[in-house]
Amino acid sequence: MLTDRLRLKKARKLLNKINKLGPKMQAMSDEKLQGQTAIFKKQLKEGKSLDDILPEAYATVREADKRILGMFPYDVQVLGAIVLHNGSIAEMKTGEGKTLVATMALYLNALEGKGAMLVTPNGYLASRDKKELAPVYEWLGLSVSLAFAEEKDSKKKITAKTKRKWYNSDIVYTTASSLAFDYLFNNLASSKENQYLRPFNYVIVDEVDEVLLDEAQTPFVVSSSPNVQSNLYHLADQFVRLLDPEVDYVFKKDDQLFWLTAHGIEKAEQFFKLDSLFSNESRSVYRHIILAMGAHLTMRRGHDYLVVKGEVVLLDEDSGRLKRGVQVSTGIHQAVEAKEKVELTKIQKTAASITFPALFALFNKVSGMSGTAKVNEEEFLQTYNLKVVTIPTRVPVIRKDYRPLIFLTTIDKLMTAVDDVVEMHKTGRPVLLVAGSVENSEIISELLLNIGIPHNVLNAYNAAYEAQIIKNAGQKNAVTIATNMAGRGTDIKLGPGVKELGGLAVIGTEMLPKRVELQLAGRAGRQGDPGSSQFLISLEDSFISSNNTPRQKKYYRKLMKKKSKGKDITLLSGPRIRFSLLMLRTRKEDLNELMRSQTNKMEIILSLQRKNFYTRRDKIMKTDDLQEDVDRIIDNALNLYLEKQDLSNKSDLKYFINQHVTYQQVNVPDNLKTKKAIKDFLKELAYKILDEKKHVLINKKQANDFYQQVIISSMDGNWIDQVDRIEKIKINAQQWGRSGRPQDLLHQEKAFEAYKDFLDKITLSTFDNLLLSKIFTNEKGQLVVVFN
């Protein structure tokens, strides 16, 4: 906190300057205030920095916000905007007006003409903020866009020209996932006319902890042609349904471990008609059995995934939201689809992928906003070099946060939660009851329906109505059951008479990560309103049972034994159990941080390769004369081929020519005995074939287009295999780590070897495609290249 005070001390000096400029801005006419933008741009061209013009620019936007929106940013909001400009994270509590804070930082950083973005976790927030704030930016002379198609336009084809217009706006609002996919597709474009992104400059990441921490390990993937799909998924699913849990397999629920018993193995061999389940020939069958068992035993519908319109969609463990477009890796997803009897999605090869940490590392300056970033301050600093600065609230927080109640069983916990809702509902006090999963939200809903308590349910099934449900959650008599997704987004404003009843009551019914708990508690008590939070947890909560130590499991079994003998054990208390659960949560959060750190280290390697590849690819697309590149490729390819093969035998050389140079018969001289002589002969032959192709080409530009198509096609085809290879290296890194050497070092070595091999493959396939491809022009006069 001392560091925060020092950082804010500097910011307060700037705030004083901004406040002193207030009367000057207030006295300006609309026309004069609007003219400030042109003045600032001129000052920047003359050598002033953004820091130099910050006080006057912020004072300008502040006054514009008042005139256009009727809202004048408070001092604490200006402090938040200063922190954002400095490339740090502003931690601001729920209801403190982060949306308005962004106007100042975005305006200032857009003045250089390089672009400024605000990226949100979901489309609703981006669309809402752009619609609300665009009038301010446009009034001040800046262009603003929403860089994705809204739901009503989602089926329309978006052209590169449209996207170019979006991303060339001074200020861009978009979602993190839209930006990730646009970046990947932009770098897979077949020509510069199909590209639309300019270099990334400045970004504010809204809900930065959700994007850079919770979603850090989820890669965004563009797929290419699918791998061959196995037909064993349905058969393995049928087999697993026949298994008897008493004799055919062992399932350790707490550890999520399972295996077939000797009886189960014998049953598998009979079912699949195998001599041995563990022979090399049966390896695929065994793998599919394990996948099917995992789908049935460890993947729970309503907890880990939902089936929406015939599609298996994963659920985010922390936010409770649907993770559309994301699959569990290595066949588990298809096994779940077989279990749910929906159409199997094809396992596809990855054409391109990127994670959020790698994406935002491409910006010159990154800042962020969140209500709960301080919990992970050290991780933000170490991983992203982002400082977290807590902005003081405008008025003190008076919410009452009660100590968690610990129950032995889930049923005791849920019945207490329902009783609490009933008591509060009698007074008319609104309640937000948070369930840990979709499954639990529906159980609680049924309990409330049975006793006649009207309520709304917010979970991944009806996320489309989130804004409306949350908007009404603070009204008198409102009871809202929600998953963790209620922790972010739209503010819950109190209705008439609710303050007098004690404000919104938040009741959590699961043990959650500390940051998620703070998010949910923060839904109550916004802007000095009264409110309360109370978390009810049980030793049967999935967060606890899946992370318990053997000692804690023994303690739980001991208590359950006593309860089964008639002893009344409902509430658990005392410092020992509280400390034990606190340590359990700390261990789990430390493990999550370690996993994110390892993923980020490995992703850095792919990021470097991706950046190098896209730079090379971009250069090829933007080069008007590729003859030198083609000359170099031919020379390097022949060197590589001659290093790998001995072509001194005439028949071997002829075979090589038919495979890599031309399908036509070629007279090969008898005197080619040295590598140099063979290389010179092959090089001369290669240029002769290229010259023959040029007769089909009308001019130098068309010849360059041919070179471009061949090189880009070779690069893209090999890049797909390279990404696939790096992913396999990443998966195997943990196993290699058992050798005693650091995982990240082993991963780095293997990835470097793979990249060197990848560059060689591009050279060789480009050589082959230059010479063996067929070219012609279609009826529109366009060049068509056919690769064999």
From Swiss-Prot:
Database matches in InterPro entries: Helicase_ATP-bd, Helicase_C-like, P-loop_NTPase, SecA, SecA2, SecA_CS, SecA_DEAD, SecA_motor_DEAD
Enzyme class, broadest EC rank: translocase
Organism phylogeny: Bacteria, Bacillati, Bacillota, Bacilli, Lactobacillales
Organism: Lactobacillus johnsonii (strain CNCM I-12250 / La1 / NCC 533)
Transmembrane stretches, start-end: none
Role, per record: Part of the Sec protein translocase complex. Interacts with the SecYEG preprotein conducting channel. Has a central role in coupling the hydrolysis of ATP to the transfer of proteins into and across the cell membrane, serving as an ATP-driven molecular motor driving the stepwise translocation of polypeptide chains across the membrane.
Pfam families: P-loop_SecA, SecA_DEAD, SecA_PP_bind, SecA_SW
Entry-linked HAMAP family: SecA
Record localization: Cell membrane; Cytoplasm
E.C. numbers: 7.4.2.8
Family, per entry: Belongs to the SecA family.
Keywords: ATP-binding, Cell membrane, Cytoplasm, Membrane, Nucleotide-binding, Protein transport, Translocase, Translocation, Transport
Gene: secA2
Protein name: Protein translocase subunit SecA 2
Quaternary data: Monomer and homodimer. Part of the essential Sec protein translocation apparatus which comprises SecA, SecYEG and auxiliary proteins SecDF. Other proteins may also be involved.
Annotated residues for binding of ATP: 77, 95-99, 491
Origin: domain of life: Bacteria
Single GO biological process annotation from the record: protein import
Catalytic activity as recorded in UniProt: ATP + H2O + cellular proteinSide 1 = ADP + phosphate + cellular proteinSide 2
UniProt membrane topology term: Peripheral membrane protein
GO cellular component: a single term: plasma membrane
UniProt-recorded Gene Ontology molecular function terms: ATP binding; protein-exporting ATPase activity
